[in-house]
Amino acid sequence: MSNIHKSLALRRTISSSAFTMFMLVAMVGLFSLFSIWSINRAWIEGTKHTVQMDSLSRAALDAQVSFKVQVQEWKNILLRGDDPALLEKYLKSFHAHALQTQENISQVKLEASVLGMNDLASEAEKLVDTHKSITLRYETTLVEAQAGAAVISATVARKIDVSLRGVDRDLENSIGLFADEIVDFAIQERSSLEARMQDRYFTLRWFIISVIGFSLVITAYVLTRALRATRT
């Protein structure tokens, strides 16, 4: 009978140990699967937002570049406007980059609105209006000074330059600061995403390590009981 009792006690101990280990493994597995799913979902959503911010920053930087080129082409008009062919060439380029600047800033406005960044969208809208006003002022001044002539003389070019000198400076600075602000936003979003993913990874890792340690302790305890049961 004593051997039978020992055998039953050993079986109960082994069964209890197996059940405990099964529950621990199942718990670790389920939590790990949920954590991986959660991390993956957060990563996908965060990456999507980061990509949108990168697109926003590229549009702002493109607007900054295209406006600088537009201003440079205006200077070329004044410097080389005494040649009809060059005047036509630089006028076309001036208008093309003016349109490109408008499109880039408008894209920033649209994407900022989609992201719920209403302050940036409002700021972009103001830049669009200011740019339109300055471009129109360039064009009107040129037409009036040119007075139907096929070229721009050096004297006329100097008068135009004096009347419009520095008119682009505030807008260029505003677009530059605007672009820098958006780039900083994009960098912060990327850094925040990386930090969140790192925190979740560390949480999952330490949980698994803790459960494994706890499992080893439980296993050692159950095995100790099993050994004692075989000796009594």
Q: What role is predicted for each listed range?
A:
Residues 1-23, 197, 203, 231:
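Positive-inside N-terminal membrane-insertion signal
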Residues 14, 22-69, 84, 88, ...:
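Amphipathic alpha-helical segments and their boundaries
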Residues 19, 23-30, 213, 217-221:
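Generic alpha-helical transmembrane segments of integral inner-membrane proteins
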Residues 33-39, 77, 220-227:
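Transmembrane helix-loop junctions and nearby membrane-interface residues
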Residues 55-59, 155-170, 201-205:
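Individual transmembrane alpha-helices with interfacial aromatic-anchor signatures
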Residues 64-71, 91-159, 170, 174, ...:
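Heptad-repeat alpha-helical coiled-coil/4-helix-bundle sensor or tether segments in soluble regions
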